Amino acid sequence: HSVKYLVLEKFLFPKLSDYSEIDELLKKKGVMTWVNCPRRMWEGYEYIKSLIVPELPVEYTFEGGEWGMCCNTIHFVDIFMALNGAASFEFCIDDLEQEVVDSKRPGYVEIHGTERFTTANGSVLRLTSTTAFDGVSRSIIKNGNNIIEYFEGKGEIVVNGELKNVPVHYQSGLSGILIDELLEKGSCRLANYEQSASYHVAYLSKIAPFINKIKGWTSESCPIT
């Protein structure tokens, strides 16, 4: 049996050279491939997307404590890019702490500090992870006259002070929807491999040397899960 559709989990691959090799293989085999960063499927983000004025930049900020920055940055990058519509971004690591810590998952690493992503259309994503954080984690999205706060874990979106309740999504509830979309339409709402791989490569090409330098490693791969 030949494979028609493939959905890969993030973080895609730890080595930069893997991305082009896999891309060639998928094209050679004719396999349509997406990457499972599912916020694009969330009702809350679809609602926020409907409020975005596409001609104006998106300013997206998320701050939390111990939320697994290395592991989960790509999720925020993916939805940020979906909201602002740009094709690529610049990634700044100047405000990261010069320390690499062990991840909760054995054999992997984590970082703290602030990551900043900017696009040619003036959009900015700021992600902050601090051990001292004791507030309520939320995404703050500014665009035009709108200030939007999204409390993902509570299913609450506040737009200019007005509360809207949205479903809290779990992967168990999204997998069936995703399969139905693929079988019925031959496509889905996730980023395709080419899009997501470009985000992964842009992130990994900065974060891998940063981590390897601090750890004194000479490997070309980086243990991000």
Q: What does each of the following model-derived ranges do?
A:
Residues 1-4, 180-225:
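C-terminal helix-rich "cap/oligomerization" subdomain common to oxidoreductases
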Residues 1-4, 19, 27-28, 101, ...:
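N-terminal glycine-/serine-/threonine-rich beta1-alpha1-beta2 phosphate-ribose binding loop
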Residues 1-40:
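Beta-strand-loop-alpha-helix segment that lines the small-molecule cofactor/substrate pocket
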Residues 3, 30, 55-59, 112:
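A general structural motif
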Residues 20, 42-43, 71-81, 172-177, ...:
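A structural signal for well-ordered alpha-helical segments within the folded catalytic domains
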Residues 43-59:
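Rossmann-like NAD(P)H-binding beta-loop-alpha module
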Residues 59-134, 194-197:
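Rossmann-like dinucleotide-binding domain that binds NAD(P)(H)
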Residues 105-110, 116-182, 187-194:
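NAD(P)-dinucleotide binding in Rossmann-like oxidoreductases
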